[in-house]
Amino acid sequence: MSIKEEVESRKTFAIISHPDAGKTTLTEKLLLFGGAIREAGTVKGKKSGKFATSDWMKVEQERGISVTSSVMQFDYDHYKINILDTPGHEDFSEDTYRTLMAVDSAVMVIDCAKGIEPQTLKLFKVCKMRGIPIFTFINKLDRVGKEPFELLDEIESTLEIETYPMNWPVGMGQNFFGIIDRESHTIEPFRDEENVLHLNDDYELEEDHAMKNDSAFTQAIEELMLVEEAGETFDNEALLSGDLTPVFFGSALANFGVQNFLNAYVDHAPMPNARQTNEDIEVSPFDLDFSGFIFKIQANMDPKHRDRIAFMRVVSGAFERGMDVTLQRTHKKQKITRSTSFMADDKETVNHAVAGDIIGLYDTGNYQIGDTLVGGNQKFSFQELPQFTPELFMKVSAKNVMKQKHFHKGIEQLVQEGAIQYYKALHTNQIIIGAVGQLQFEVFEHRLKNEYNVDVVMEPVGQKIARWIENEEDIKDKMSTSRSILVKDIYDNYVFLFENEFATRWFEEKFPEIKLYGLL
C-alpha cells in the first residue's frame, strides 16, 4: 500500500462533551464495534470493579470522570480510526484544547435531556475557531429528554451552525422504539429481538407491524416529513468547512445508534489535514519526509515503571521505528527505538505509522509539549500549542523533608505533562503551582501521593492573575511586593503574580515601561 493510500485510510477524531453526557461510554462502544475490546467497562459501575477502558488512571476510576486524554486505535471497514477521549471536566480544558490540535474532526456528545451545556459550548468554540468538522451524537434517547426539533434548534441558535439530522428517533424514554435512517429508509428497532423494518419512498411501513398504528411512529413520520419538506440535502463541503454538523440520535449505554453513526462517520469524515509551520510552509500529509509534533506528555502510564510517554501526531511521511529524527527545538538528532500505540493503559510496539496516526514515544526528559520532530534535512517547526493563564495558585511543599527528592521528581514530571504550571518565587525559592481549576490541584495532590509516595502541604496564595513580561531586562527588584510577586516559570521566564485586577492596573500605571501580557 502506498503512503497516499495509507493516509487516506486514517480518520482521527476527538470526542467532546460536558461531564456525564456519555462521552466515555460512546468511546467504549465504538471500540467494541472495532473489535478493539470484548466487553465495555461502565463508568459508573465502581462496585463491580469494571472501569471504562479509556479511564485508566486511578483517580479517574475512583471518580468516574476523565481528567487525562486517552488515545485508542482500531480498524473498521478498511479504515484505521484514532480516537482521542478528552477530559470532560472543565478544569482540564487546557489538555483538551491541546488534544484538539491533534485531530482532524470531532464528535460532540449531547445529553438529550440537557441539550447544550457550558463545557460543550466552550469546546465547540475551540473546534469552530480551528475549523474542525463536527459530528453530533445526541445521547440517552432511552430516557425522557427534549424533543428532536427543540434540540436541533438549540444547536443551531446556540452554536451558530447548521444541522442535518442523519437519522430520526421514534419516541423516547419508555416509548423509545428506534431510529429511522434517512438514507436507507429503514428503521433500526431499539429492542434486539425486532428485525430491521423498511419504509417506502413515502415513509410508509412496508412490513405488517403493530407499530403502524403507534402514535410515536406516526409523530416521528410527521416530523420527518417536515424535515424532508425543508428540502435541504446533505452538504459534505459544509461539514468539512465547519459550517454544518450531521446529527445522530441514539443511546451509547444501550449500544444503540452507535454503528449507524460509525458507518456514516467513516463515509464523511476528513482524512488527515495539511499543517502550517511557523515558517509559513504548508506540510502535506502526502509529503514523503516524516514530520510530527508532541501534543501531550503523560507520566506513569505504568506506575510500576515510572515511565513517561510523549504523545506524537504524525503529520507527514512514514514513521519507522529505529529511524533518525531531529528535535527542532534543540536541533539534536536522535534515534527513536521505543514507540507504542495505546488501548488506554495497554501498550503495543509501533513499527510503522503515517499521517493521522497518534503514537507514544518513551521519554527520558527530552520532549516538551509543542515539540516538532522531523526526518531528513527539513528545517521547520509546527505552530506552538496554546497555554492557558492559570487563575488559581498554591504554595506547595513536601510534608516530610526526607522526601524532597521524590517531591521534586514528581513535580517535574507532572508539570511537564502540562496539567499544572510551575513557578518559583525569586527570593525565597518557594514553589508555587498554578491551575485553571481546583480539581487540577486535587489530582496533583492525589498523584504525588499515589505515584511518588509523597504527602504535600498546599496553601492558597493571595495572587490570582499571572502576567508575563516582554522586556525582562527592565525588571527591578523593587517591583516585587506582597501584591505583585515576581516569580520564574518552568522555562525561566519572569512572571508577575498579582492579587487582583486593581493590583495589576496599579502596577501598569506605576511602571509603564514594563510590558505585561497574559496567555490564553
Curated annotation (Swiss-Prot):
One biological process term in Gene Ontology: regulation of translational termination
A Pfam family per the record: EF-G_D2
Record flagged with keyword Cytoplasm: yes
This protein's GO CC annotations: cytosol
Primary site of residence: cytoplasm
Residues noted as binding GTP in the record, renumbered to the chain: 17-24, 85-89, 139-142
Keyword Glycoprotein: no
Keywords on record: Cytoplasm, GTP-binding, Nucleotide-binding, Protein biosynthesis
Family note: Belongs to the TRAFAC class translation factor GTPase superfamily. Classic translation factor GTPase family. PrfC subfamily.
Function: Increases the formation of ribosomal termination complexes and stimulates activities of RF-1 and RF-2. It binds guanine nucleotides and has strong preference for UGA stop codons. It may interact directly with the ribosome. The stimulation of RF-1 and RF-2 is significantly reduced by GTP and GDP, but not by GMP.
Protein's UniProt name: Peptide chain release factor 3
Lineage: Bacteria, Bacillati, Bacillota, Bacilli, Bacillales
Gene this protein is translated from: prfC
